[in-house]
């Protein structure tokens, strides 16, 4: 399974083409729209989310509510495009006023300058329109399709926020993934700990008041993945490596860890590795899950636990210093409409990209063409592991 996306932040639409999704999967627009609505929520979002109400159009690969096995085409309209039709026109324009609106002041922390150097753009709008986090809209749409695959084989995915602006959640004593999801869906910052959630909102308010931005840490948990998914044979087949790449590919994400993560560097081996246990009811398992569900790039059967670090959004209403690429004079960086904090929304994006990688691994390992055969093969793998 793979997907490609196309479209600019203020262009007419965003598009995703999904290849390799098995035939026979029940899929409706409402499955995807539910995830798109979750992405648009979150304390600290900017005015753009008041303009857009993201809804998907499925224009290929689905008939009568089921996937066909052919490529799936997903389209999400940018409603704000009506205000940008001249600036984002496909054909050449001769409107001098619009030409003068080109972006020549790169923003620190963005792809503006690097992208202009790479592609030879003198107007950095050509860079920022595509490097914008608006593109994650269709990545969430693709992830919604992946979640449907995982649901069919009894695999559940949940994401939540564990830190914003230095405020870290301490109360994480949820008894099930369902409880975690129920509580975080009601939290404006998608945090299970209500006391920490309140302090996170206060930190976001402070950032907004001061024209600044703050980042944080999100966690994604995947339960129900059979042992033995992924591979230790080659570096590019390790499932944890694919998930790590997917997490860091999200806009503004700068780090990733599994299980106890970087804490492993500060502990002796006896406090890092998970002891193996066995019972007639469960077969082989682990006493703990410090590895976060992976050993050697292969799933252990324990929950996958992965965290990603999101830096503060670089677009600031109190802009940092930069240099105009035309005049070479120092200026305060350009300001684009932005959020004070997008960590809650980013947890939904992280869910989506992790779901895609896990679903792709399941489809590859247990049969690529038909959903019914994949379900049979996954159940067979679970029985095999239990009886091993």
Curated annotation (Swiss-Prot):
Residues noted as binding NADP(+) in the record, renumbered to the chain: 39, 45
GO biological process, one term: amino acid biosynthetic process
Gene Ontology terms for molecular function: chorismate synthase activity; FMN binding
Protein EC: 4.2.3.5
Pathway where this protein functions: Metabolic intermediate biosynthesis; chorismate biosynthesis; chorismate from D-erythrose 4-phosphate and phosphoenolpyruvate: step 7/7
GO CC terms of this entry: cytosol
Group of enzyme by EC: lyase
Keyword Amino-acid biosynthesis in record: yes
Cofactor(s) the protein needs: FMNH2
Xref: Pfam families: Chorismate_synt
Transmembrane regions listed in the UniProt entry: none
Catalytic reactions on record: 5-O-(1-carboxyvinyl)-3-phosphoshikimate = chorismate + phosphate
Entry-linked NCBIfam families: aroC, PRK05382.1
Subunit annotation: Homotetramer.
Protein name stated in the entry: Chorismate synthase
Species assigned in the record: Geobacillus kaustophilus (strain HTA426)
Name of the gene encoding the protein in the UniProt record: aroC
């Amino acid at each position: 399974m793979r997907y490609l996306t196309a479209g600019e932040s203020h262009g007419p639409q965003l598009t995703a083409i999904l290849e390799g999704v098995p035939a026979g999967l029940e899929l409706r627009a409402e499955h995807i729209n539910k995830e798109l609505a979750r992405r648009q929520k979150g304390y600290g979002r900017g005015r753009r989310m008041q303009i857009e109400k993201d809804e998907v159009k499925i224009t290929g690969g689905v008939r009568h509510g089921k996937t066909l096995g052919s490529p799936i085409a997903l389209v999400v309209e940018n409603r704000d495009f009506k205000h940008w039709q001249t600036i984002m026109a496909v054909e050449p324009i001769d409107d001098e006023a619009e030409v003068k609106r080109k972006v020549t002041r790169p923003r620190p922390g963005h792809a503006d300058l690097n992208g202009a150097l790479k592609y030879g753009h003198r107007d950095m709008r050509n860079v920022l329109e595509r490097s914008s986090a608006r593109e994650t809209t269709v990545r969430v749409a693709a992830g919604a399709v992946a979640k449907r695959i995982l649901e069919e084989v009894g695999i559940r995915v949940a994401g939540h926020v564990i830190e914003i602006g230095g405020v870290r959640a301490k109360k994480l004593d949820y008894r099930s993934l369902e409880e975690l999801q129920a509580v975080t869906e009601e939290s404006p910052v998608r945090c299970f700990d209500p006391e920490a959630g309140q302090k996170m909102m206060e930190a976001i308010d402070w950032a907004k008041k001061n024209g600044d931005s703050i980042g944080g840490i999100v966690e994604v948990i995947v339960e129900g993945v059979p042992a033995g998914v992924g591979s230790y044979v080659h570096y590019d087949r390790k499932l944890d490596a694919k998930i790590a790449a997917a997490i860091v590919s999200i806009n503004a994400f700068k780090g990733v860890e599994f299980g106890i993560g970087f804490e492993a560097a500060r502990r002796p081996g006896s406090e890092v590795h998970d002891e193996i246990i066995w019972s007639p009811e469960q077969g082989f398992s682990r006493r703990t899950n410090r590895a976060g569900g992976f050993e050697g790039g292969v799933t252990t059967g324990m929950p996958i636990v992965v965290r990603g670090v999101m830096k503060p959004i670089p677009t600031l209403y109190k802009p940092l210093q930069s240099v105009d690429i035309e005049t070479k004079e120092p200026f305060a960086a350009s300001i684009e409409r932005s959020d004070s904090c997008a960590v809650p929304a980013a947890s939904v994006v992280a869910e989506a990209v992790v779901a895609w990688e896990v679903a792709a691994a399941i489809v590859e390992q247990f049969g690529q063409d038909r959903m019914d055969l994949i379900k049979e093969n996954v159940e067979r793998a679970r029985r095999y592991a239990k009886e091993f």
